[in-house]
Amino acid sequence: MAKVNAREARIVRHERLRKKVSGTEARPRLCVFRSIENIYTQVINDNCGSTLVQASTKDAELKAELDGKTKTEQAVVIGNLIAKRSLEAGISEVVFDRGGYKYHGRVKALAEAARSGGLKF
């Protein structure tokens, strides 16, 4: 039997997680994707399949603020930004979708920053 690599294992974990976690209009899903250099977040309403709010380290307005920070510090900035944008859009409660990643490091830093920014999980 072939050995499963880390990426495939994460995808399997994410599929298993998605069976249990679904976003609604009242409580959308905060989805996290972590790449080698960047981190992306979206607030998604799964009933109609639309992205309500998004934030990532590739946002042009954050370029100067993120320069020289570690990836974990950048995740904190993104967590605060997604919380601010969500509250402006009238979203105060979300379901957290960690994307198959361990709740550790950048994912944990983003989640805690979003909580401190005013989002309820």
UniProtKB/Swiss-Prot annotation:
One matching Pfam family: Ribosomal_L18p
A GO biological-process term: translation
Molecular function terms from GO: 5S rRNA binding; structural constituent of ribosome
Cellular component GO terms, alphabetical: cytoplasm; ribonucleoprotein complex; ribosome
InterPro entries in the record: Ribosomal_uL18_bac-type, Ribosomal_uL18_bac/euk
Keyword flag Ribosomal protein: yes
Record keywords: Ribonucleoprotein, Ribosomal protein, RNA-binding, rRNA-binding
CDD domains found in the cross-reference section: Ribosomal_L18_L5e
Keyword Ribonucleoprotein attributed: yes
Family in the record: Belongs to the universal ribosomal protein uL18 family.
Summary of subunit composition and partner proteins: Part of the 50S ribosomal subunit; part of the 5S rRNA/L5/L18/L25 subcomplex. Contacts the 5S and 23S rRNAs.
Function per UniProt: This is one of the proteins that bind and probably mediate the attachment of the 5S RNA into the large ribosomal subunit, where it forms part of the central protuberance.
Protein's UniProt name: Large ribosomal subunit protein uL18
Organism, as annotated: Dehalococcoides mccartyi (strain ATCC BAA-2100 / JCM 16839 / KCTC 5957 / BAV1)
Name of the gene this protein is made from: rplR
